[in-house]
Amino acid sequence: HVGTTDNLMSCEEWDNECGKVYKGMIDAGVESVMIGHIRLPEYQRKLKPGIKDNEIMPATIAPELLQGLLREQLGFNGLIITDATHMVGLTSQIRREDMIPTTIAAGCDMILYYRDKDEDTQALKTGLEKGILTMERLDEAVTRVLAFKAMLKLHTKKANGTLIPPAEGLSVIGCDEH
């Protein structure tokens, strides 16, 4: 990617195409959604009347899309994960130190990839201090991550030694068939 992508569908087109797919998956019980660094200008204008063109951000940092469209309109209650945060579609829009707390504040629960764990942790702390992110929203995100891990039974798999598949299971990763 060399920049942020715009999905130029009208709201009606999006509802009848992408929206039906999302709603069908949500109704079928999908537990997580990965958010792309794509803008959806027509929907963003509908959900946030008066939004200026330069305020239309990629979905990853757009609360009107994450909370308004995905959670409220489509009824998704699972884990929202960012796409890779080092991609230009996002980094061209916001500095990393602001991106980290802004993604969580906007409605993402988990950030995919970190450049430097300590740096990103500090960015979250600074975001809390600056008011970019509230402790309530951070707690909500952490709760969703922990619930997702519990749903996958990661805690019991780690305890009984089955978290990492046996060697024969791992051997299929990267094999010619895959």
Task: Enumerate the predicted regions with their spans.
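Generic low-polarity alpha-helical segments
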Residues: 70, 74-75, 132, 146, ...
